[in-house]
Curated annotation (Swiss-Prot):
Binds 1 Mg(2+) ion per subunit. Binds 2 Zn(2+) ions per subunit. This is DNA-directed RNA polymerase subunit beta'. Belongs to the RNA polymerase beta' chain family. The keyword tRNA-binding does not apply. Signal peptide: none annotated. The RNAP catalytic core consists of 2 alpha, 1 beta, 1 beta' and 1 omega subunit. When a sigma factor is associated with the core the holoenzyme is formed, which can initiate transcription. The gene is rpoC. Zn(2+) 2 binds at residues 815, 889, 896, 899. CDD domains: RNAP_beta'_C (cd02655), RNAP_beta'_N (cd01609).
Length: 1433
C-alpha cells in the first residue's frame, strides 16, 4: 500500500507570480506520463490505461473505487491498488491532477516565436523568417563555427551546404565531430527547436545587455537604435525575473497534460462521444511523438525523421495556440479546434466567463409588476420563489422546532409546500433582505437590497420609485433576485444597499428616486392654482379649518385661499399668512416641518429640489417616509383628477396658416435674391433652412401659449408636458404644430445628413400626406437602427472605463499635496454653463479662501467647501478658487479623500475604501446609452438651431477689449475687426467685476470703442453668420496673383441667374497658390491675403477697395443636422486620446506669422518669437488658414482649421491644460444631451490616462530610453541612485568595476584602503538620475499597461499580456478589484479593506483584561512599562 503526495494551494495568498515553467517543475506537478493516445474504451466506457484519461495517473472515475474494483468504499482511502495502480480517493482529484508527455525532440513554444514582439528572435538577434526556417526544419543554424572557415555563429545553411561543410571539415580536421561539445574547435550546426535550445543555453544575458545599451546610447541611426531598444526590453525582462526564468525554457522538452475533467469526454446516445477539442489536439501530439520514437528506434532515414519532427512541432503549436497559425487544425465540420490559448481569450474564455462572471446559487428571476402600496425599502416576493430561496433556513427552523427529525423529510415538507412552512418562512425572512438586479446593470444602483414581503402570484413586485435607478418599466421587464447568506452579507445589504438608503445618484448627487409620470401629474394637478373657483379668496385660521371647508364642499381644491401656516425662517419656527390652496396644504401635511412651507406648483424639477433639501435637512429615514407619502398622494390625486386627454385637448393654433404663409413669402424672397445673384447657392440653402427653423420656433411658442391658457391652464396635454410627467415641447409641437424640417437619408460615405429644405407642414392631428409620411419613415427607422448599434458601443465604453479605473480606491485621508486646480465658472459666450458654486461644492480648498471685501476667512485650507460657503463665494467677487483634485493627488496607490472631496451618494466626505474609480466609470458609462438612444421618438427631426448674427449687451457696463485690431470704415460709424483672437468683456462700472465674456469673430462690425459705456440691449457687434470673410485692412487697388482660371479657380455660373463668380479650387498646379494683394498708387504691396479653397471672390482684379470692405466670402457649411454622432464617438475619441481625422496645425510658440514658399501643395508658415526663435509649419493648401501675415499668435493657437489634438496641447501647454481640455470637451458632449455628471468622475479617468511617463534620458538608472513607466517608479528609482557614485576607472580596486554604482560610504572605505596600500584609487562621477516626459494614453492602452497582469489579461489581448508577464516573472500584488475577484478573494475596498482584516472587536472589559495580561507577561522587573491608551470608542 503506497501513499501519494498531496499539494493543496492555500487560498490566503497575498500575491501571485507568473513565470515560465521549467521541465523540472512540469514533472514535479505531474502524476504520471501519458503514453497512449487512447481515451476510453467504447464498450466498457472505462478509461484506457496510460491513455489521456488514465485512472492511474489522474485518479479514479468513481469516488473511492479503483479501476479493477479490488478496493471499494471510503475505508480504503489513500491506498494505491496493487493490481491496477489506482489510488483510492475521491473523484474530484481528476479536476486537479496533471500528467505530462515526454517529447522525443525539443519543441519551441509558439507564443515565444509567433507573437510580436518575437521573444526568441529578439534574444538571439534573428529575424522571424529565419527563425521559422530553423524551427520548421528547413535550415541548419551554426551554433559554434569551430574550425570551419568563413562561417560565424547564427549563419543559416541549407542541407547541401551543411553536408558539404561536414565533408570538408572531415577532410581537413579529422575526428573533429568526435570532440566534446564544450571544445571550442568543434564545428556544431543543428536544425529545429533543438538548435534553438542550444543557442538559448549559450545566451549570456548580461553581456548582451551591456552591448545593446552601448549601441542604444551611441548609434547615430534612429532605426538601429530603436531595434536595439526593442531587443533590450526582452533581454531586460529576463534579467528582471532575477534568475527565475531561463531563456531555454521557451523551448519545451516536456508538455503538461491538463486534468481530464477540464477536457471532458461525454458519451452521447447512439454510441458516439462528445469531446473537448483539447483531447483531439493532445491525441495528435501523442500519436506523432510515439511514431517519432519508433522511427528513431528503427533508425529511419533522416528525411523521414525530419518530416516527423516538423509535424510534432506543428502538433504542439496547434495545441498551445491554434488561432495563430495560418493552417489551423480543423474539426470534421471545418471549424478550427479550440486550443489552450483560445480557452483563455475573449468573452467566452476562462477569465471573463468563469473567473469574473460566475453563475450563483440562491437566485431566481421573474417578471416585475408595480407594487404601489409597498414602502420604499420593500419588494413583493412570490411565495413559491421565497420558499425555494430560503429553503435551507426553513429546513433548519423545521428541525429546531422539532417538526421533523431529518433534513430529508424537511425537504419533502418544503417541496410539498405544506401550510406549516409559511409562518416559518415569514419568521425567517424578517431582517433578511434580498438583492434585486435588473440587467443591464449599468451602475451600482442596478442592484439594490429590499426587505421582501410574501405575495401571491408569480411576479415580483417593485416599488415604483426605484424604477428610475433600475431603468425598469413594467412592459415585461424581468429581474433577478439574489439572497445574501452570511451575516456580514446581510448586514451590508441592510446598511449599504437598502433601496431607501440609495436616494442620491452617485453621478451628480441629485435625488434619483423622484416621482415620475402619474405621481408627478397628480401632485402638479393639486398644487396648481385656479382663480375664480369656489371659495377663491377665503381666509382660514389654520390648515385644519381649510381641510374641513374642503371636505364640506365649501372650497375648491384649486382655489387660491389665505391660511395661517407654520413656516421655518433661518431655523426659527414662525406663523405667517400665505396665499395658497387646499391642494398645497395637503402636500404640506407630509413635508417635514423643518423644510418649511412648500408653496409652489410641483413639477418634476421642483420635486427633485424639495427631495434634495429634505435629505440635506432631515436625513435619509425621513426622506424615505416623505417619498412614500407623496407617492400615495400623487397616485390618488391623479386618479381623482381623471387626467386623461382626448382629441379635442390637442389644440391647433389658429395662427398656423398665417405663419406658414409668412414662411412661404420669405422663402420666395430668398429664391428671388438667389436668381438675381445676390447670394450664393449655399447661402440660399442656409437661409431657407433658417427661415423654416424660425417659423417652427414661433409656431411652438404660440402653441404653448395657447395650450397654457386653455381651460385656465388645466388642459391635460399641457399639464402632462408642463409637470414633466410625459412628453416634451418637441413632441407636442409635432402633435399640434408642424413636424418641421427632416434630415435627408445619408448616402453611405457622404457627409453628415443634409436637411431637406421643404419642411413637413402637417402635424399628427391633421395627418401627414403620403410624401410627408414617406419622408418621416426614414428618420423613424434610422432612430431604431442607431439605437441598436450604439447600445453595444456604450457598453464597450463602460467596460474600458471600468478596466482602466478599477484600482482607484480611496487609500488615505490626506496625501499632503500642495497642488490643485484653478476652477472658474464655465461660460459659453454669454450663458453660464456651470456656475462656480456647482464646480467647487463638496471639494476641498487648497488655500484659505478670504472674502475680498470683508477680509473674513470663508473656508480654511484643507477644509471641505460646504453649501453655505460655496454660496458666499458665488455671491462674492471671487472669480477663481483653487481646489484639490484627483488630477493633482500624490497618493502612491489610489487617491486620498481630501483630493476627491465629497461622496456624491451620501453628501458627506468620502470614506477610506470607497471605490471611486468604478463609480466614476459607471457614472460616465451609464448615460452613454442615453447619448446613443436620444435619436428616439422625434424621428430624425433636424434639431437645427437658428443661427444668430449679432451681439446685444445683456448688462449696463464698460467695454474692455483684449488683443483687438480694428480698422475704421470710411463714411461709416462702425469699425471692422481684423484680429482673430479678440475678447470682449463687459465690466461693472462700480466694482470692476466682469459681467460677460465674448469672443468677437473676425470681420465683424464693431459699434463701440474701448472704454465705452453700454446700456442693456445695445448692439455691440454684428457679423455674417453664413460666411467666413476676408476683409481689407487698407485702402488701395486689388491685384490677384496665382488666380488662374481652371488651375486655381473656376467660374461657376449660377443655374438660375446665369451670373458668374470665381470660386477658388484646390490648385492643380502645386507650385501656384492664389493670393489677393492690395497695392497703393506707387505699386507698393500693402497687404497680402491668401485665398483658401472654396472661397467665393467678390471683387475683380484692379478694383479699388475701401478699408473694411469684404474681398472674399467663404460659405460656412451650416445646416448639418445636429445628430448625435457627436455623442458617443466623440467621447470615445477623447478617452482613447485619438487624433481627430483632420487635426489643426498648432503654433508651439508665441510669435508673429510670416508666409513662406509653397512646397508640394503645402504652404510654409513661419512663426517668429520676439526673441528671434523661429518655427516652420507646412499647411496643405486645401485647409483654410485662420491667420494672416503679421498676425501675432500665442502658443497653442491653431493656424489652420480642424480640431486640436490632445497630444499637441500636452506638448505645448503642458499636462494641466490637456487634463482640463479632455474633462471639458467630454462634459460638453454630455451637457448637450442634458446629462449632468460631476467633474470629479472625469478627473478620475483622466488621472488614469496620465499615470505614465516616457523616459527621455535614462541616466544611470535601470530604465531604457523611450520606455513607458509609472511616474512613481521613476521617482523611486531616482531616489535610489540619489547621492550614489558611478565608477569611471576602477584603479587597482579588486572589488569595484567600471560602470558600477556604489554608495559614497563604500567608495570612501575602498579608497582609504587603497591609499593605505599606496595603490591607484577609484575614480568616480555622480550618478545621473533619469528624466522623463509626461505622456497621455488612451484608456485601452492604459488598461493594458496596469501593474497587474491579471487585470490586463482579463481585459484584452490575453495571450500577449500573459506571455510578456511570464518572461518578466511579474508579480501581481492583488491591489485592484479585478485581480482579487479572479483569485476569489474579497475586494480590497469598502468593507474588504485589508486594514480591517486584523481588527478584533471586543468588549471594553475584555480589552483591559487582555492588555493587563500582556503587560504582566512582557514586563521586565526593572523598567516600568509605558501606559497604553485604550481607544475611546
Amino acid at each position: 500500500m503506497a501513499f501519494r503526495k498531496e499539494n493543496k494551494i492555500k487560498n490566503n495568498f497575498s500575491k501571485i507570480r507568473i513565470t515560465l515553467a521549467s521541465p523540472e517543475e512540469i514533472l514535479e506537478n505531474s502524476f504520471g506520463e501519458v503514453l497512449k493516445p487512447e481515451t476510453i474504451n467504447y464498450r466498457t466506457y472505462k478509461p484506457e490505461r496510460d491513455g489521456l484519461f488514465c485512472e492511474r495517473i489522474f485518479g479514479p472515475v468513481k469516488d473511492f473505487e479503483c479501476h479493477c474494483g479490488k478496493y471499494k468504499r471510503i475505508r480504503y482511502r489513500g491506498i494505491v491498488c496493487d493490481r491496477c495502480g489506482v489510488e483510492v480517493t475521491e473523484k474530484k482529484v481528476r479536476r486537479e491532477r496533471m500528467g505530462h508527455i515526454h517529447l522525443v525532440v525539443p519543441v519551441a513554444h509558439i507564443w515565444y516565436f509567433r507573437s510580436l514582439p518575437n521573444k526568441i528572435g529578439y534574444l538571439l538577434g534573428l529575424p522571424t523568417k529565419k527563425l521559422d526556417a530553423i524551427i520548421y526544419y528547413e535550415r541548419y543554424v551554426v551554433i559554434q563555427p569551430g574550425v570551419a572557415e568563413g562561417l560565424s555563429q547564427l549563419d543559416l545553411l541549407s542541407e547541401e551546404e551543411y553536408l558539404d561543410k561536414l565533408d570538408e571539415i572531415e577532410r581537413t580536421h579529422k575526428g573533429n565531430q568526435n570532440l566534446e561539445d564544450t571544445n571550442p574547435d568543434k564545428f556544431i550546426a543543428k536544425i529545429g527547436a533543438e538548435a534553438i535550445y542550444d543557442l538559448l543555453c549559450r545566451v549570456d544575458l548580461d553581456s548582451i545587455s551591456y552591448e545593446l545599451r552601448d549601441r542604444a546610447n551611441t548609434d547615430g541611426s534612429q532605426q538601429r537604435k530603436t531595434e536595439a531598444l526593442k531587443r533590450l526590453q526582452v533581454v531586460e525582462s529576463f534579467r528582471a525575473s532575477k534568475g527565475v526564468n531561463r531563456p531555454e525554457w521557451m523551448v519545451m522538452k516536456v508538455i503538461p497534460v491538463i486534468p481530464p475533467d477540464l477536457r471532458p469526454l461525454v458519451p452521447l446516445d447512439g454510441g458516439r462521444f462528445a469531446t473537448s477539442d483539447l483531447n483531439d489536439l493532445y491525441r495528435r501530439v501523442i500519436i506523432r511523438n510515439n511514431r517519432l520514437k519508433r522511427l528513431i528506434e528503427i533508425k529511419a532515414p533522416e528525411v523521414i525523421l525530419r518530416n516527423e519532427k516538423r509535424m510534432l512541432q506543428e502538433a504542439v503549436d496547434s495545441l498551445f495556440d491554434n488561432s495563430r497559425k495560418s493552417s489551423a487544425v480543423k474539426s470534421d465540420n471545418n471549424r478550427p479546434l479550440k486550443s489552450l490559448s483560445d480557452s483563455l481569450k475573449g468573452k467566452q474564455g476562462r477569465f471573463r466567463q468563469n473567473l469574473l462572471g460566475k453563475r450563483v446559487d440562491y437566485s431566481a428571476r421573474s417578471v416585475i409588476v408595480v407594487g404601489p402600496e409597498l414602502k420604499m425599502h420593500e419588494c413583493g416576493l412570490p411565495k413559491d420563489m421565497a420558499a425555494e430561496l430560503y429553503k435551507p433556513f426553513i429546513i433548519r427552523k423545521l428541525i429546531e422546532r422539532g417538526i421533523v427529525k431529518t433534513v430529508k423529510s424537511a425537504k419533502k415538507i418544503v417541496d410539498r409546500k405544506e401550510p406549516v412552512i409559511w409562518d416559518i418562512l415569514e419568521y425567517v425572512m424578517k431582517g433578511h433582505p434580498v438583492l434585486l438586479n435588473r440587467a443591464p446593470t449599468l451602475h451600482r444602483l442596478g442592484i439594490q437590497a429590499f426587505q421582501p414581503k410574501l405575495i401571491e402570484g408569480k411576479a415580483i413586485q417593485l416599488h415604483p420609485l426605484s424604477c428610475t435607478a433600475f431603468n425598469a418599466d413594467f412592459d415585461g421587464d424581468q429581474m433577478a433576485v439574489h439572497l445574501p447568506l452570511s451575516n456580514e452579507a446581510i448586514l451590508e445589504a441592510q446598511l449599504l444597499m437598502l433601496a431607501s438608503h440609495n436616494i442620491l445618484n452617485p453621478a451628480n448627487g441629485a435625488p434619483i428616486t423622484v416621482p415620475s409620470q402619474d405621481m408627478v401629474l397628480g401632485l402638479y394637478y393639486i398644487t396648481k392654482l385656479r382663480p375664480n373657483t369656489k371659495g377663491h379668496g377665503l381666509i382660514f385660521y389654520g390648515p385644519e379649518e381649510a381641510t374641513i371647508a374642503y371636505n364640506e364642499g365649501k372650497v375648491d381644491i384649486h382655489a387660491p385661499i389665505k391660511v395661517y401656516v407654520e413656516d421655518y425662517e433661518n431655523g426659527e419656527l414662525v406663523r405667517r399668512m400665505v396665499e395658497t390652496s387646499v391642494g398645497r396644504l395637503m402636500v404640506n401635511e407630509y413635508v417635514p416641518k423643518k423644510v418649511g412651507y412648500v408653496n409652489e406648483v410641483l413639477g418634476k424639477k421642483a420635486l427633485r429640489d424639495i427631495i434634495g433639501s429634505v435629505i440635506k435637512i432631515c436625513g435619509v429615514a425621513t426622506t424615505a417616509k416623505f417619498l412614500d407619502d407623496i407617492k400615495n398622494l400623487g397616485y390618488y390625486m391623479a386618479f381623482k383628477g381623471g387626467l386623461s386627454f382626448n382629441l379635442a385637448d390637442v389644440l391647433i393654433p389658429d395662427e398656423k396658416d398665417q405663419l406658414i404663409q409668412e414662411g412661404y413669402t420669405a422663402v420666395e424672397q430668398i429664391m428671388q435674391d438667389y436668381s438675381m445673384g445676390f447670394i450664393t447657392f449655399n447661402e440660399r440653402y442656409n437661409q431657407i433652412i433658417d427661415t423654416w427653423t424660425h417659423i417652427n420656433g414661433r409656431l411652438s411658442n404660440v402653441l404653448i401659449k395657447q395650450l397654457s391658457s386653455d381651460n385656465d391652464g388645466f388642459n391635460s396635454v399641457f399639464m402632462m408636458m408642463d409637470s414633466g410627467a410625459r412628453g416634451s415641447k418637441e413632441q407636442i409641437r409635432q402633435l399640434s404644430g408642424m413636424r418641421g424640417l427632416m434630415a435627408k437619408p445619408q448616402k453611405s460615405g457622404a457627409e453628415g445628413g443634409q436637411i431637406i429644405e421643404n419642411p413637413i407642414l402637417s402635424n399628427f392631428k391633421e395627418g401627414l400626406s403620403v410624401l410627408e409620411y414617406f419622408i418621416s419613415t426614414h428618420g423613424a427607422r434610422k432612430g431604431l437602427a442607431d439605437t441598436a448599434l450604439k447600445t453595444a458601443d456604450a457598453g464597450y465604453l463602460t467596460r474600458r472605463l471600468v478596466d482602466v479605473s478599477h484600482d482607484v480606491i480611496i487609500t488615505e485621508e490626506d496625501c499632503g499635496t500642495l497642488r490643485g486646480l484653478l476652477t472658474t465658472e464655465l461660460k459659453q459666450n454669454e450663458d453660464v454653463v456651470a456656475s462656480l458654486y456647482e464646480r467647487i461644492l463638496g471639494r476641498v480648498s487648497v488655500h484659505d479662501i478670504i472674502h475680498p471685501t470683508t477680509g473674513d476667512i470663508i473656508v480654511r485650507a484643507g477644509e471641505e467647501i460646504r453649501e453655505q460657503a460655496a454660496q458666499i463665494i458665488e455671491d462674492s467677487p471671487i472669480e477663481a478658487v483653487e481646489i484639490r483634485s484627483v488630477l493633482t493627488c500624490e497618493s502612491k496607490k489610489g487617491v486620498c479623500a481630501k483630493c476627491y472631496g465629497r461622496n456624491l451618494a451620501t453628501n458627506r466626505m468620502v470614506q477610506r475604501g470607497e471605490v471611486v474609480g468604478v463609480i466614476a466609470a459607471q457614472s460616465i458609462g451609464e448615460p452613454g446609452t442615453q447619448l446613443t438612444l436620444r435619436t428616439f421618438h422625434v424621428g430624425g427631426i433636424a434639431s437645427n438651431v437658428a443661427t444668430e448674427n449679432s451681439l446685444l449687451s445683456k448688462y449696463d457696463g464698460i467695454l474692455e477689449f483684449e488683443e483687438l485690431r480694428a480698422v475704421d470704415v470710411t463714411d461709416e460709424s462702425h469699425q471692422v475687426v481684423v484680429s482673430r483672437m479678440t475678447e470682449l468683456r463687459i465690466a461693472d462700472p462700480n466694482t470692476g467685476i466682469i459681467l460677460a465674456n465674448h469672443n468677437i469673430p473676425y470681420g465683424a462690425k464693431l459699434f463701440f470703442r474701448q472704454g465705452d459705456a453700454v446700456k442693456k440691449g445695445d448692439k455691440i457687434i454684428e457679423w455674417d453668420p453664413f460666411n467666413a470673410v476676408i476683409v481689407s485692412e487698407v485702402a488701395g487697388t486689388l491685384s490677384f496673383e496665382g488666380v488662374v482660371e481652371n488651375v486655381t479657380f473656376k467660374m461657376e455660373s449660377d443655374e438660375t441667374t446665369g451670373l458668374k463668380e470665381k470660386i477658388i479650387i484646390e490648385s492643380k498646379d502645386k507650385t501656384m497658390a492664389p493670393y489677393a494683394r492690395i497695392i497703393d498708387e506707387n505699386g507698393e504691396m500693402l497687404k497680402n491675403y491668401s485665398l483658401p479653397m472654396g472661397a467665393h471672390v467678390v471683387k475683380d482684379d484692379g478694383d479699388t477697395v475701401k478699408v473694411g470692405e469684404i474681398l472674399v466670402k467663404i460659405p460656412r457649411s451650416v445646416g448639418k443636422a445636429g445628430d448625435i454622432t457627436g455623442g458617443l464617438p466623440r467621447v470615445t475619441e477623447l478617452f482613447e486620446a485619438r487624433n481627430p481625422s483632420n487635426p489643426a496645425i498648432v503654433s508651439e510658440i508665441d510669435g508673429e506669422i510670416g508666409f513662406g514658399k509653397l512646397k508640394r501643395g503645402n504652404r510654409e508658415i513661419t512663426v517668429t518669437s520676439k526673441l528671434g526663435e523661429e518655427k516652420k509649419y507646412l499647411i496643405p493648401l486645401s485647409k483654410q488658414l485662420l491667420v494672416q501675415e503679421n498676425d501675432f499668435v500665442r502658443a497653442g493657437t491653431p493656424l489652420s482649421d480642424g480640431a486640436i489634438t490632445p497630444a499637441d496641447i500636452l506638448a505645448i501647454k503642458g499636462p494641466t491644460a490637456v487634463q482640463e481640455y479632455i474633462v471639458n470637451e467630454v462634459q460638453d458632449v454630455y451637457r448637450l444631451q442634458g446629462v449632468k455628471i460631476n467633474d470629479k468622475h472625469f478627473e478620475v479617468i483622466v488621472r488614469q490616462m496620465m499615470r505614465k511617463v516616457e523616459i527621455v534620458d535614462p541616466g544611470d538608472t535601470l530604465f531604457l530610453e523611450q520606455q513607458v513607466v509609472d511616474k512613481f517608479e521613476v521617482m523611486e528609482e531616482n531616489d535610489r541612485i540619489w547621492g550614489k557614485k558611478v565608477v569611471i576607472d576602477a584603479g587597482d580596486s579588486q572589488v569595484l568595476k567600471a560602470g558600477q554604482i556604489v554608495t559614497a560610504r563604500k567608495l570612501r572605505d575602498e579608497n582609504s584602503m587603497l591609499k593605505r596600500k599606496d595603490l591607484k584609487i577609484v575614480k568616480v562621477r555622480d550618478a545621473k538620475s533619469a528624466t522623463a516626459s509626461q505622456i497621455l494614453q488612451g484608456i485601452t492602452r492604459a488598461a493594458l499597461q496596469t501593474k497587474s497582469f491579471m487585470s490586463a489579461a482579463s481585459f484584452q489581448e490575453t495571450t500577449k499580456v500573459l506571455n510578456e508577464a511570464a518572461i518578466c516573472g511579474k508579480t501581481d500584488y492583488l491591489e485592484g478589484l479585478k485581480e482579487n475577484v479572479i483569485c476569489g478573494h474579497l475586494i480590497p475596498a469598502g468593507t474588504g479593506l485589508r486594514d480591517y482584516e486584523k481588527l478584533v472587536v471586543m468588549h471594553r472589559d475584555d480589552y483591559e483584561k487582555a492588555t493587563a495580561e500582556r503587560k504582566s507577561f512582557l514586563s521586565v522587573p526593572t523598567a516600568e512599562p509605558a501606559m497604553e491608551e485604550a481607544p475611546s470608542e
